[in-house]
UniProtKB/Swiss-Prot annotation:
GO terms for cellular component: extracellular region. Expressed by the venom gland. The record marks M46 as: Key residue for inhibition of muscle alpha-1-beta-1-delta-epsilon (CHRNA1-CHRNB1-CHRND-CHRNE) and important for inhibition of neuronal alpha-3-beta-2/CHRNA3-CHRNB2 nAChR. The keyword Secreted applies. This three-finger toxin binds and inhibits the nicotinic acetylcholine receptor (nAChR). It comes from Ophiophagus hannah. It is found in: Secreted. Disulfide bonds join C24-C40, C33-C58, C62-C70, C71-C76. Residues 1-21 form the signal peptide. This is Short neurotoxin SNTX11. It holds the Pfam family Toxin_cobra-type. The record marks T45, F47 as: Important residue for inhibition of muscle alpha-1-beta-1-delta-epsilon (CHRNA1-CHRNB1-CHRND-CHRNE) nAChR.
Length: 78
């Protein structure tokens, strides 16, 4: 009986972990990422000279541009 309960506990823990989704900051608020999006990012880009634009959110892969940050824990891209 104890073995059955232990097995049930392990299966429950594994199943709960499979449903985890990452939460990232956006410029305004939070974003719940899609299951395949494993990273949060923050990057600053210049669309016009002397006018930096901040981009934040979920991503499938880390950006490689200069002035970018990539991380993989909840709300890590503030």
């Amino acid at each position: 009986m104890k073995t059955l309960l232990l097995t049930f506990l392990v299966v429950t823990i594994v199943c709960l972990d499979l449903g985890y989704t990452l939460i990232c900051h956006r410029v305004h608020g939070l974003q719940t990422c899609e299951p395949d999006q494993k990273f949060c990012f923050r990057k600053t880009t210049m669309f016009f000279p002397n006018h930096p634009v901040l981009l934040m959110g979920c991503t499938y892969s880390c950006p490689t541009e200069k002035y970018s940050v990539c991380c993989s824990t909840d709300k890590c891209n503030k």
